[in-house]
Amino acid sequence: GFFSTVKNLATNVAGTVIDTLKCKVTGGCRS
């Protein structure tokens, strides 16, 4: 349903943001 889709999108965005922050903090960016 709609809420399930929104939840999945939010989870994906949060995961991306966290990965980006980790990358910047550790300097271990992976492309």
Curated annotation (Swiss-Prot):
Alphabetically ordered keywords of this record: Amphibian defense peptide, Antibiotic, Antimicrobial, Disulfide bond, Secreted
Q: What highest taxon heads this organism's lineage?
A: Eukaryota
An annotated GO cellular component of this protein is: extracellular region
- One GO BP annotation here? defense response to Gram-negative bacterium
Q: What does the tissue specificity note say?
A: Expressed by the skin glands.
Disulfide pattern: 23-29
Where does this polypeptide localize? Answer: Secreted
**Summary of the function given for this chain in its UniProt record:** Antimicrobial activity against Gram-negative bacterium E.coli.
> Belongs to which family?
Belongs to the frog skin active peptide (FSAP) family. Ranatuerin subfamily.
Name listed for the protein in its UniProt record: Ranatuerin-2PL
In its UniProt entry, the species of origin is given as Lithobates palustris (Pickerel frog)
